[in-house]
Amino acid sequence: ESMLHENAYTETRQMTEAFNKMLGRLRVLDDSRTEFVSNVSHELKTPLTSMKVLSDSLLTQEDVPVELYKEFMGDLSEEIERENKIINDLLSLVKMDKTADTMNISSVNINTLVERILKQLRPIAAKNNIEVVFESFRPVTAEVDEVKLSLAITNLVENAIKYNQENGWVHVALNADHKLFYIEVADSGIGIAPEETDHIFERFYRVDKSHSREIGGTGLGLAIARSAIVMHRGAIKVYSQPGKGTTFTVKIPLTYVS
């Protein structure tokens, strides 16, 4: 009988522990969801506040000079663009969460895909005299969801351009073996401190809070990139040192396994 009691006690204790663990996990999930919503609200409100201030100051002034009017309109346009980027990033992320089960897999030429992305981003890099170089070691064709993978690579290269230094460089390399293909995005940028690297894939996490406004972006890019890569059963790693640039390495199976 004492044996039965002991078993029942052990089972009850195990159930209690399991339940507490589950509660803990739900609490963490709930906290991160609450934080996510408050971050979203903050991100969306910031450009709106700027727009309100700009338009109010135009409305309250008599006979505004044309130059000032144009300058304010330019600023307004920038804020609208910023708001648009935030909304697009959020939609991408929500879509990722929603379509985690639906992968539109097709056979894609990865070389062409990367070249197309770099062609789109080179004009942005050119503004700060940043050279974007693509090194392909072999032709690579893989089974991927083209839209999701494009989003991941675009975000990685965009970040490399954004957090770079004037007259810097971004080096993108593509390689493959018989099982996986590898994409490396290296830059000569500001780098990331060791204690920050664990957090950079979190939604809304920004390494450089002080410059986040002038650099722009939402802090969602890397979360989106990682989501897309994980959906391909791939992995992403980061190597970085402050002031010495950052390298992201991505590996993804050539053949998609659902």
Go through the PLM ranges and name each one.
Residues E1-V37, K52-V64, G74, K95, ...:
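Membrane-proximal HAMP signal-relay module
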Residues E78-I86:
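Short alpha-helical segment of the dimerization/phosphotransfer core of two-component systems
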Residues K98-V108, T112, E143:
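Short flexible loop/turn segments at helix-to-beta-strand junctions
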Residues N104-S107, A126-K127, E131-T141:
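Conserved catalytic submotifs in the C-terminal HATPase_c
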Residues I110, G191-E202:
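Short helix N-cap motif at coil->helix boundaries in the Bergerat
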Residues A160-I161:
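Short helix-loop "hinge" at the ATP-lid/N-box region of the Bergerat-fold HATPase_c
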Residues N167-K179:
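Short beta-strand/loop element within the Bergerat-fold HATPase_c
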Residues D187:
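Acidic ATP/Mg2+-coordinating residue in the GHKL
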